[in-house]
Design a protein with these regions (language model features):
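N-terminal acidic, glycine/proline-rich low-complexity segments
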Residues: 1-255
Length: 255
C-alpha cells in the first residue's frame, strides 16, 4: 500500500474486520494517507428505518454477520474511519435481499467453467442446506452456532423462498422450490465499480459524506435489480471463461 498514490486505495471488506482493525491500529498514518474509501459488507444501527447516531454523532455497526464475527474490531473500524474523515460505503443485507439470485445461477457457473464453477456450486449447496437447518434450530444450540436469533425459519422462508413455507422436506436445495440465494460479496464489489446501479443513502459525519446502501427493506438502495443481477452474473461468468481459457492455453503449452 505504501507504493500506490495517496488517496487511491478503495478497501473492500467482505468478512470479519479483525485484520482491518489491526492494520488501522498499527499503521494509522499510512491508512489515512492512502485510503480514498472503505466499502464494508455489513450494516449500521438504525431506528425506525433511520440511521441512529451515537453520542459522538457517528454511525455504529449493527448485528450483521460480518460485524458479529469480531464486534470489537467492527466497533473500532467504523469509529476510526469516521473520526479520520475517510468515506465509508456500507452495503447491508437489505440490498442483498432485494437482488436475489435463483439457484439456476450456480448451474450457469458450472456450464461456463467445469472446475471453478462446479466448485462454487458444490460449496454453496451444503452451505444453504446448513443455513436452513440452523434457522430451524433452537437458540443456543450447536446446530444454530453463531446464527443470530433473528434468523428464524420464518426469516429464511421470507428471504429465500418468497414467503412460501415448503413444509417438512428432506433438502432445501430444490429447483422446484424456487429458492433464492444472495451474492453479498459481488454486490459490495459492484457498488464500487458500477455505482450507477445503486441508490445509496448519504449521510454527512463531521463534514465527510458516507453512504449506506440498503437502509431498510423499503429502501434497498438498488436502482434496478434485474440490471444489477445481469451485470453481476455476466461479469462472474466472463471471468470464469477467461480463467478456463487461460488454463487451457497453459496446459497446451506444457504438452
Amino acid at each position: 500500500m505504501e507504493k500506490v498514490p495517496d488517496k487511491s486505495v478503495v478497501l473492500l471488506l467482505n468478512s470479519g474486520l479483525t485484520d482491518t482493525a489491526e492494520l488501522m491500529k498499527n499503521n494509522p498514518p499510512l491508512c489515512k494517507r492512502k485510503l480514498s474509501r472503505v466499502a464494508i459488507m455489513g450494516g449500521v444501527v438504525c431506528e425506525e428505518e433511520q440511521i441512529k447516531l451515537n453520542a459522538k454523532g457517528h454511525m455504529t455497526p449493527d448485528d450483521a454477520a460480518n460485524n458479529n464475527f469480531d464486534p470489537e474490531s467492527a466497533e473500532f473500524v467504523y469509529e476510526w474511519l469516521q473520526s479520520q474523515n475517510i468515506p465509508m460505503s456500507v452495503l447491508t443485507r437489505n440490498a442483498a435481499y432485494a437482488c436475489k439470485f435463483d439457484i439456476g445461477f450456480y448451474e450457469s457457473l458450472v456450464k461456463s467453467d467445469n472446475t471453478i464453477g462446479r466448485g462454487i456450486r458444490d460449496r454453496q449447496r451444503p452451505a444453504t442446506e446448513h443455513l436452513w437447518k440452523a434457522a430451524n434450530a433452537p437458540s443456543g444450540s450447536e446446530t444454530r452456532g453463531t446464527l443470530p436469533d433473528r434468523c428464524t425459519r420464518k426469516w429464511f422462508v421470507d428471504a429465500y423462498l418468497d414467503g412460501i413455507d415448503p413444509g417438512k422436506i428432506e433438502n432445501i436445495w430444490d429447483p422446484t422450490l424456487k429458492i433464492g440465494t444472495f451474492q453479498y460479496d459481488p454486490l459490495n464489489v459492484a457498488s464500487m465499480v458500477r455505482p450507477e446501479l445503486f441508490v445509496p443513502t448519504k449521510i454527512t459525519v463531521d463534514k465527510t459524506e458516507h453512504q449506506v446502501i440498503g437502509l431498510s427493506s423499503p429502501e434497498p438502495g438498488i436502482a434496478n435489480a434485474d440490471n444489477l443481477r445481469k451485470d453481476i452474473r455476466d461479469n462472474i461468468i466472463n471471468a470464469l471463461k477467461l480463467v478456463s481459457s487461460s488454463d487451457q492455453q497453459n496446459n497446451t503449452c506444457e504438452t
